[in-house]
Structures are given as structure tokens and as C-alpha cells.
Amino acid sequence: MKILISNDDGYQAPGIVALHDALKTIADVEVVAPEHNNSAKSNALTLHSPLYVQTAHNGFRYVNGTPADCVHIALTGLLGYRPDLVVSGINNGANMGDDTIYSGTVGAAMEGYLFGIPSIAFSQVDKGWGEIESAARKAREIVQQMDRQNLVGEAPWLLNVNIPNMPYDALRPLRMCRLGRRHAAERVIEQQSPRGELMYWIGGAGAAKDAAEGTDFHATAHGHVSVTPLKVDLTDYDGLGYWAQTVARLVPAQASGEVA
């Protein structure tokens, strides 16, 4: 089994080091990750400036770009082979609910999925890397289980996994979940630069809004490892009928080519 590993915290982050060390015992692994922290970069690609790939002393390759850049470059020429699995993380903090829209960790895994490769995004629920070895061990266990069920290397799928910061033996079983929801982000933070200019920092993520049973928020709060299958299609299928009727009322029959 060949695995490509990336992340959004940067190639030196404890999460990706722990994940690499855990997975190298069961597979051929290669790391291609951002040079610096690229959190909240989602699926962004760098199109208007050159990207450079360098190799660290431990063999990790790092790119002056986004998480999606790293996976894209790896899969379109850098590796020279097609991996069986793309794994992203382990992220320093949760990627639950609305976080998945912004997450560079999820973005890296989604890039693998877009190239037709099964992909998993791993995150720890709390920041600070507490119990990171436990999280890496759980990630390895999940990958092994997927491989044993012949799911690795087959039709593409995308999973978002959040692991509580707990000792391995204290973690409760995997729980299949839907995404919860957060409240809107906190108010922007205003500061004054040394030159007297007003500058802004994006506020923190909002608290959980929908943390009902069945959500990733609920599962991890009760010690479970949450697993959520994701998809790329953003179509609002429930709203298609409503909007078809609404748009039909907005567009004159002649413009739509219909005969009155």
C-alpha cells in the first residue's frame, strides 16, 4: 500500500510527524506538505506565482504553497506513481461542522478525492497536540481496517475523521456522523499597526450551534471518534424543485424558448 501524506499545519508540525511515523509501519509513505502553516486555505490552488519543492533532512518534501497545491503537485508529476490512499493531518484542532468548508486539512484530502483516490482527513478535537501519539495510533488502525476491507485503491471516497485528545484505551468506538453546525464566527479583531493604521484579524470560530445526537460535535464530546463521509457536489437537491418554479416565474416564456 502506498500512501501520500499532507496537512495544513506545515511539514514540521507534530501531527504530520506522528501520522507519518505511525503509517510507515504498515505502508510505503511519502510526505508532501506546506512549508508553513496554511490553515483555513480550503481547496485553494496557487495559480499566479511559482511553486518550489524542497526536501527536509527527514525526507519530507515541502512546498511554498497550499495544502491542495501539495497534493496536486504530488499527483500530477512529483511522485511518479499513483498512491493507493491520500491522508491529511493530523490537524491541530477540530474540523467539524462548518469547519470543513474552510479547512486546509479537508482541502488536501479532497484534492486526492478529486483525482479519484480514496482520501481521509484526520484532526484532533482540541489544539495543543495533547495525546497526539494516541491519535496517530487510531489513524493507523482506521487505515488498516479500510485496507483489510479492500477499500483502499478502489473507487474514490472521502472521509473526515475527528479524534478526541484522549489516551488510546479511553477512546470510544468510531461513530458515523453527519456534520453539525457552528454559530457565525466571532467578531473581527481590530488593532492598530505600529504606523497607526487600522488592521484586522479574523475572529475565532463560532461555538457549536447544532450539536445534536448524530453530529460530529456530539460524538466527539462523548469520547467517540467521529467519521463523516463527505462529497464535492454542492447542489441543493432539496431546493431544486423550489428554485425551478421560482426561476420559471422570473424568466419570460419567450426568453426561455417556450411557446405561450
From Swiss-Prot:
Reaction(s) the record says it catalyses: a ribonucleoside 5'-phosphate + H2O = a ribonucleoside + phosphate
Top-level taxon of the source organism: Bacteria
Function: Nucleotidase that shows phosphatase activity on nucleoside 5'-monophosphates.
GO cellular component, one term: cytoplasm
Chain positions recorded as a divalent metal cation binding sites: D8, D9, S39, N91
Record organism: Acidovorax ebreus (strain TPSY)
Subcellular localization: Cytoplasm
GO MF: 3'-nucleotidase activity; 5'-nucleotidase activity; exopolyphosphatase activity; metal ion binding; nucleotide binding
Family: Belongs to the SurE nucleotidase family.
Cofactor: a divalent metal cation
Key words, A-Z: Cytoplasm, Hydrolase, Metal-binding, Nucleotide-binding
Pfam families given in the database record: SurE (PF01975)
Class of enzymatic activity (EC top level): hydrolase
Cofactor binding, per record: Binds 1 divalent metal cation per subunit.
Listed EC numbers: 3.1.3.5
Name of this protein: 5'-nucleotidase SurE
